[in-house]
A protein has these predicted regions:
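Short, basic (Lys/Arg/His-rich) helix/loop patches that form interaction surfaces
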Residues: 71, 127-136, 146, 196, ...
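C-terminal secondary-structure termini that scaffold catalytic or DNA-interacting sites
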Residues: 165, 176-178, 184-193, 200-202, ...
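N-terminal core-binding DNA-recognition domain of tyrosine site-specific recombinases/integrases
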Residues: 7, 16-93, 111, 225-231, ...
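Basic/aromatic DNA-contact patch characteristic of tyrosine site-specific recombinases
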Residues: 1-9, 13-17, 25, 61, ...
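Basic, Lys/Arg-rich DNA-contacting stretches centered on the C-terminal catalytic core
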Residues: 107-109, 133, 151, 165-197, ...
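Catalytic-site neighborhood detector that most strongly recognizes the C-terminal catalytic loop/helix
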Residues: 108, 116, 174, 281-307
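Basic, Lys/Arg- and aromatic-enriched nucleic-acid-binding interface segment
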Residues: 75, 90, 94-156, 164, ...
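Short, polar N-cap/turn motifs at the start of nucleic acid-interacting alpha helices
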Residues: 160-167, 272-294
Length: 330
């Protein structure tokens, strides 16, 4: 019979080819491409192995050695492995994925969720940002009062501010390229493209930020380059530390992204319905809004029920026998 040539493609060869194809076909962005290559580097112990020789035991051994990675990193590694093995099956290099019967491993690391600022922390931070010269404080304030993502704020041009209709047009975001340069992309999803309404205070504040300028980026760094969220995060964190803003007794970590959560949390606390919040935040799906803010919604479910209860009692809609009898009409 005919002799079938054995496929000796290594894990690295196929993985790299797959990622290169994705970026060439515009399936992924430059920043995602860069991250995927970083993830691939972490799988170096499997890199030179031929795909057909990688076993489930190899994968288990790899993960056992790396349970100190953050959960998000383990998820990314698992995802990339899965994609490569799926591709290898499609190409007929292997008949079954060694990952098939394995679940995502659980990290040893405690995941510190990014949390919102409390009302007290927010008031303290606001006071500091309003009265001190803090780098990128304008970007922090816009995030605090619109809930926009950091990358969306950094990508704003002056002409994206519509003072006639008091809104900000969101249609792009920044990310980092392979050489650490800042790339401006369209927003990640359709839902990301939106109009964010602003109040008169914020409109006046933005007019101040713009000054005499007529176009170009709304915010730039000291060397006139676009700002990265990493830069803002650095100064945000510094400010919290320097002015002792963070309540250390609370769980969860505070980052620049906390300002988006803070805005959303204040919205829920003041009774904004989930569907409206989804639109403001630019979430593709209501489930994202509900999952990210479920604990805040739950807390306010009780408060809303109390309000309903009060309203009913006020209008004599009460369970149990009443003092006054309703007269039966014959």
């Amino acid at each position: 019979g005919a002799f079938k040539k054995v496929d000796k493609t290594t894990f690295y060869e196929l993985a790299e080819k797959m990622i290169e194809e994705q970026v060439a076909l515009n399936e992924i962005r430059q920043s995602t491409y860069k991250r995927k290559l970083e993830t691939l580097k972490m799988l170096s112990s499997l890199s030179d192995k031929q795909l057909r020789k990688i076993t489930e035991d190899d994968i288990i051994a790899y993960f056992k050695d790396n349970l100190d990675y953050a959960q998000s990193t383990l998820n990314k590694l698992y995802q990339l492995l899965g994609a490569v093995f799926k591709k290898a099956m499609k190409k007929g290099i292997i008949s079954k994925s060694p990952l098939e019967d394995l679940r995502v491993p659980k990290s040893h690391k405690k995941t510190d969720k990014v949390r919102a600022l409390t009302v007290e922390e927010q008031a303290r931070l606001l006071d500091v940002l309003n009265n001190n010269d803090i780098n990128y404080s304008e970007i922090m304030l816009v995030s605090m009062f619109t809930g926009m993502r950091g990358g969306e704020i950094c990508a704003l041009n002056i002409e994206d501010i519509d003072f006639q209709n008091n809104c900000i047009i969101v249609n792009k975001t920044t990310s980092r390229g392979g050489d650490n340069s800042v790339i401006v992309n369209e927003t990640k999803t359709e839902a990301g493209m939106r109009k964010v309404l602003i109040n008169n205070d914020l409109a006046a504040f933005l007019k101040e930020c713009i000054g005499e300028r007529t176009g170009g980026s709304l915010f730039v760094s000291s060397n006139n380059k676009p700002v990265t969220t990493q830069q803002v995060n650095y100064y945000f964190w510094n400010t919290l530390k320097q002015y002792d803003i963070q309540d250390k007794s609370l769980q969860g970590k505070l980052t620049f992204h906390s300002l988006r959560h803070t805005f959303a949390t204040r919205c829920i606390e003041s009774g904004v319905p989930p569907k409206v919040l989804q639109k403001i935040l630019g979430h593709k799906d209501i489930s994202v809004t509900m999952n990210v803010y479920c604990d805040v919604f739950e807390k306010f479910e009780a408060a809303h029920l109390n309000a309903v209860d009060k309203y009913m009692k006020l209008n004599n809609i009460v369970l149990g026998k009443s003092e006054t009898k309703t007269v039966k009409v014959a």
